[in-house]
């Protein structure tokens, strides 16, 4: 169950700094060159729940897992991302303790557009009925090596699914 009182950013309508957006775009372009989705998380001050001002890239382990065991991991990093969930959970706890919570989990899509796929939804829910973390989710579209779109998604309790949420980009402060 989403706890919007303690984690209001999970409702979306966030404000990303221009520097954060540019870094996410750069990570997406670089990952495109490696033929894999970028992934990581975005953080911000707990005292300003809507503000997102930090980027923490993570390694997409999908290609490595596919090479090790293609039967268990049939998809490659081009259409899927896999992060170290234990490291991610540690970062969530650390962010809460230090007043710089994880607010957004981000990843890119290669040559297919910015949408929240059924796979994205299943990964976000981690096999449960709803996501275990109160986060928003940013998907960046990269086509031909160029970022052409991005969309923010949040969990909607009443719909029992993910819906698009608006977000703003802060030019300067």
What are these regions (language model features)?
Residues 1-102, 113-173:
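Conserved beta-strand-loop surface patch within small alpha/beta domains used
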Residues 103-109:
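Active-site neighborhood of phospho(di)ester-bond hydrolases with catalytic His/Asp-centered motifs
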